[in-house]
Amino acid sequence: NDEPVKQYMMPPIELLNLPNNTNSSDYEREQKLNERKLIDTLNSFGVSTRLVGVSRGPSVTRYEIQPAAGVKISKITNLADDIALNLAASGVRIEAPIPNKAAVGIEVPNKSRQSVTLREVIDQSSYKNAKSKLTVALGKDITGEFVYSDLVKMPHLLIAGTTGSGK
């Protein structure tokens, strides 16, 4: 067989769907309302804090608060159900403390989740310029940053699914 080996060409990215345009003013309104409710809720239980940052991801927003001096972290973590009730959220997750930060993170589910499309993840320079040929696009993290991994560094990766499902 003397046929030359053809170089594989990736299909054009235009075949993939663009992300839906989302109304950022709705997100900002929801965020401001939740910020106020969160601080008011903590204050009503005698927990003095200040908001030091907000990170919005596709499905969760993390509100970073800094407790006043003398406030025990356990007092904040014990209020998870009360915070969820006052924010009308299905539940909240409290990360106390946030690694490498002098703050407590309160993660609240977004009222409307944002879809993350394959196109927007692989259309980033960090993916296109990845050194490994086995870089896999995973999605977005809680801060809205794109997440990738190298399959070479995952020797024990388990892929599950039914027979014939295209694993």
Summary of predicted features, one role per range:
Residues 1-156, 160-165:
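Primarily NTPase-proximal linker/entry elements flanking Walker-type ATP/GTP-binding cores
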